Amino acid sequence: MKKFIFLHIIFLLSSFSFFSQVEFNAKLSKNSLGLNERVKIEFSVDKDGDNFTPPSFENFRIVGGPSQSIRNSWVNGKRSYSKTYSYFLSPIKKGSFVIGQASIEVNGKIYKTSPININITASIDKPVDI
């Protein structure tokens, strides 16, 4: 009987990883840049999703992207998956701005990233991209 209960507990604990929460986030290559620089923004999700919708990128010009990369691996029977959407942006004007939420659908449910703050300063002498 103890073995039976123990096996059920192990089965339940291992099944929680199958139903784990979806992680969908946004990441900037830098949070502050000059008006003549570019920034890379990546939106990554750890489950296979569809219908990705980027933010409007208000106050920015898209100079590259979107590009998409997928990483899928199995190590010791455990699956690791990541899908990333990347854009290169060039600011249009100086100021502090918020890059809005992106969204993606995973298993019929919509997930959104958190908005990101970014600061655009005057043009700099030697721009350092990305």
Each model region followed by its residue ranges:
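GIY-YIG nuclease catalytic motif and its immediate N-terminal context
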Residues: M1
